[in-house]
Amino acid sequence: MNAITSASAIRTVHVPLGERAYDILIGPGLIARAGAEIASRLKGRKAAVVTDENVAPLYLKALVASLDEAGIASAEVVLPAGEKTKSFEHLITACDKLLEARVERNDYVIALGGGVIGDLSGFAAGIVRRGVRFVQVPTSLLSQVDSSVGGKTGINSRHGKNLIGVFHQPDLVLADTDVLNSLSEREFRAGYAEVAKYGLIDKPDFFAWLEANWKSVFTGGSARIEAIAASCQAKADVVVADERENGQRALLNLGHTFGHALEAATAYDSSRLVHGEGVSIGMVLAYEFSARMNLASPDDARRVERHLKEVGLPTRMSDIPGDLPPAETLMDAIAQDKKVKSGKLTFILTRGIGQSFVADDVPASEVISFLREKHA
């Protein structure tokens, strides 16, 4: 965590990407001071805040007041909440509203919301006028530790999740930890899956720390800020090494190949499965598949499942309410995964806790056999 610095209760993680470098600020009260932080970086005259119908009543007024106090004029774009908002229809709406507001390249698009709003707003900012600057103000744990960092933006299509998008780095990320107090237990747990992921990728000591301290992370306070800062630093390190996902950055997709297929299988119905829950099940499946391929110990798979189950996350396909399509349909979704190259299946597998790696050309026959076994 060498790039994390402390200023009062605020942690700063720096993402050194040359001319596109930016800071992630983590701590309480950041929405109230957002205007001052943004004003010091703003080259234009105004901002457009993109949010959703769930977040707007909670935080939009406070953010706009902070912008007003800093002398920043703002427009507001409020979209429906939920994964289905990551669509062409709502992308077009957002772009049209930004153009109506006469947002220019040196102005700011501010994404106020969870991963859906961050992904869609960043995509809109990346294509309007061929690129408008933007700021992430993530309001869920999942978006604070994952989707708001790294510049990946996009929407879903009928062929799969996050298949259409651009790389567009933010100028600033403001992760106000106070907003996490408004999350439901289910939403917080779903975000925690992404926190645990960083330990499972290449930080076994962090995973062990989470096993010992997860209750304090859920309660709040310094342990929560520490977990978020460590997660952001872990992601920043990977992004700096491989910004465009040509190699190492694919490790961040641990659990996502299986997880995205399960999300598609539930038609992105959040009453059945949300993204972090899919990642939780997907990580257990990745460890179990690694054990099946004699790459990792079954004990590691059991350890991962035990911890995720302890915090209240689903760990099995059978934990998903309702019927799932057959294994062959799940396999079709996996074949559309963005990591597929030249038709070859690519998975993030593991040799143990904190020993994940990119596995190219995974035999489809092994995957389909494994899915049939787990589907039963």
UniProtKB/Swiss-Prot annotation:
Q: Which family does it belong to?
A: Belongs to the sugar phosphate cyclases superfamily. Dehydroquinate synthase family.
> What name does this protein carry?
3-dehydroquinate synthase
Q: Which GO terms describe its cellular component?
A: cytoplasm
User: What one GO molecular function would you report for this record?
Assistant: 3-dehydroquinate synthase activity
The record's catalysed reaction(s) read: 7-phospho-2-dehydro-3-deoxy-D-arabino-heptonate = 3-dehydroquinate + phosphate
Task: Respond yes or no to whether keyword Hydrolase is given for this record.
Answer: no
Detail which positions bind NAD(+). G115, V116, I117, G118, D119, T139, S140, K152, K161
> Which Pfam families did the record assign?
DHQ_synthase, DHQS_C
Annotated pathway: Metabolic intermediate biosynthesis; chorismate biosynthesis; chorismate from D-erythrose 4-phosphate and phosphoenolpyruvate: step 2/7
Give the protein's cofactors. Co(2+); Zn(2+); NAD(+)
- At which positions is Zn(2+) bound? E194, H256, H275
Q: What does this protein do?
A: Catalyzes the conversion of 3-deoxy-D-arabino-heptulosonate 7-phosphate (DAHP) to dehydroquinate (DHQ).
Alphabetized, the UniProt keywords read: Amino-acid biosynthesis, Aromatic amino acid biosynthesis, Cobalt, Cytoplasm, Lyase, Metal-binding, NAD, Nucleotide-binding, Zinc
UniProt remark on cofactor binding: Binds 1 divalent metal cation per subunit. Can use either Co(2+) or Zn(2+).
Q: Which InterPro entries match?
A: Dehydroquinate_synthase, DHQ_synth_AroB, DHQ_synth_fam, DHQS/DOIS_N, DHQS_C
Where is it localised? Cytoplasm
Q: Which organism is it from?
A: Rhizobium johnstonii (strain DSM 114642 / LMG 32736 / 3841) (Rhizobium leguminosarum bv. viciae)
> GO terms for biological process?
amino acid biosynthetic process; aromatic amino acid family biosynthetic process; chorismate biosynthetic process
